[in-house]
């Protein structure tokens, strides 16, 4: 799923400079091509999922098309209020993508489980 997602966002960004890729501390090498080819369309917020969502909403309010992407557990649990207030209630065009459903990242411990 991750590689397919990254390929599609890459293709969209190549066609439209308004497409942005936002990540929260996913410093994986799978982003190397995107970072190299679209440095002004890539933003890494570090371990700050809520701020990533708020920034995505701000970018969307300016006509950008942000894709916010990170581990599902952190996206759902740490960002819920920001998603609710900044994206949903404001009706912002933000694409929110979480990876690692269930126990996919089980080896990293219970903080990374998306099971509730």
Segments (PLM) and residue ranges:
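Thiamine diphosphate
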Residues: 1-116
């Amino acid at each position: 799923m991750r590689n397919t997602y990254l390929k599609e966002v890459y293709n969209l960004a190549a066609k439209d400079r308004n497409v942005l890729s936002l990540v929260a501390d996913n410093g994986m090498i799978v982003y190397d091509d995107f970072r190299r080819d679209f440095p002004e369309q890539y933003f890494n917020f570090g371990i700050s999922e809520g701020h990533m969502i708020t920034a995505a909403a701000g970018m969307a309010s300016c006509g950008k098309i942000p894709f916010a992407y990170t581990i599902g557990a952190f996206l759902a649990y740490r960002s819920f209020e920001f998603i609710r207030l900044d994206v949903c209630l404001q009706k912002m065009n933000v694409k929110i993508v979480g990876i690692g459903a269930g126990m996919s990242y089980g080896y990293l411990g219970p903080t990374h489980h998306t099971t509730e």
